[in-house]
Amino acid sequence: MSTPAATTDPVVERTTANSSTSAALVVSRARVSYPDGPDIRVVLDDLELSVEPGEIVVISGESGAGKSTLLTVAGLLRRPDEGEVTIAGIATSEMSERQRTAVRREHLAFVYQSANLLPSLTAVEQLELVGHIRKERGTAVRERALATLASVDLTDRANQLPSQLSGGERQRVGIARALMASPSVLIADEPTASLDPERAAIVAGLLADAARTHRIATIVVAHDTAALVHADRHLRLEGGRLRPM
């Protein structure tokens, strides 16, 4: 489902050409620390993570362990103090913020605990907006939006506003919106935490189906069993590093 980078930035082209890894996401020797009174608190400590296309990695950990920090680093929303993040073969540590933003828009998508849908747009219009942002035009945008909604079993809810959808349906629209971006990497932060067990199982299953069907490298921060059922790997963030469970 991933598409080649639209940017012609020479740095992006050079780092893509020089990459030899098959992983869609590589976080290498990432270190992040914060001031903690007179001390320094190390949140990520030479952390390593590699996720292959179509692989689902579930990450858990205690509150304050650094899970959100890891997701912002992997999602190019903040720079690590040290280390490298490579997305779809593109090394990003030496890039400007403009270049990193271009890589993020081309290759990354996010699903959060709350879908944060625009209240005035119907389900299909939420997805069409993504297509328009990606410079897609014409009837093909609506056709792809409808097909993507169908992939999360929302064909009959396409013309409903968020206020007319259940919590589980809104979260499925959020997943469809992420898929509309044709990402190489999908980052999901507690995507089922606000749902009852039945709806959580449905949403987790749809995420897993999308990851494997479209070969999307997927990171899920979660603690519930709904997400763990579909994990290829379950890692725990502890002491600034990821450890297998």
Regions from the PLM with identified roles:
Residues 197-199:
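Helix N-cap at the start of a conserved alpha-helix in ABC-type nucleotide-binding domains
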Residues 186-189:
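Catalytic Walker B motif of ABC-type/P-loop ATPase nucleotide-binding domains
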Residues 121-130:
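Short coil-to-helix segment of the ABC ATPase nucleotide-binding domain corresponding to the Q-loop/switch region
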Residues 41, 92-109:
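ABC ATPase NBD coupling module
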Residues 161-165, 169:
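Conserved ABC ATPase signature
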